[in-house]
Swiss-Prot record:
Top-level division of the source organism's lineage: Eukaryota
Family to which this protein belongs: Belongs to the eukaryotic ribosomal protein eL42 family.
UniProt name for this protein: Large ribosomal subunit protein eL42
UniProt xrefs under InterPro entries: Ribosomal_eL44 (IPR000552), Ribosomal_LSU_eL42 (IPR053708), Ribosomal_zn-bd (IPR011332)
Keywords assigned: Cytoplasm, Ribonucleoprotein, Ribosomal protein
GO molecular function: structural constituent of ribosome
Organism: Trypanosoma brucei brucei
Keyword Ribosomal protein belongs to the record: yes
Pfam families associated with the record: Ribosomal_L44
Gene Ontology terms: cellular component: cytoplasm; ribonucleoprotein complex; ribosome
GO biological process: translation
rRNA-binding found in the keyword field: no
Cell compartment(s), UniProt: Cytoplasm
Main location: cytoplasm
Length: 106
């Protein structure tokens, strides 16, 4: 289980800032696939009509986890940086660190 803060202070490399600023952290999510991309149009054309499945469907999945990609947005200039973390099964964005009876600090 990886807990990560929703806000993080780090250096903003953008020429507008070029200083340590507060960043808002969001987990990256892949966008919706485009219906009219060249490969999708070709695939749909091939699939139409009689004949069933025309291309192999991949079943031999090798990995059990995905790498965590974070989108960090600067509070000052709104520029976005993407940051890749290691593989993990459970990932959470939290305001507070989960500790025993101690005070939560980042």
């Amino acid at each position: 289980m990886v807990n990560y803060p929703k806000k993080k202070k780090m250096h903003c490399p953008d020429e507008r800032c070029n200083a340590h600023k507060s960043f808002k952290v969001v987990q990256y999510k892949a966008g919706k696939a485009r219906l009219y991309a060249r490969g999708k149009r070709r695939y749909d054309r091939k699939q139409s009509g009689y004949g069933g499945q025309t291309k192999p469907i991949f079943h031999k999945k090798a990995k059990t986890t995905k790498k965590i990609v974070l989108k960090l947005q600067c509070s000052n200039c709104k520029s976005i940086i993407q940051n890749v973390l290691k593989r993990t099964k459970h990932f959470e964005l939290n305001d507070k660190k989960k500790t025993g009876n101690k005070d939560p600090t980042w």
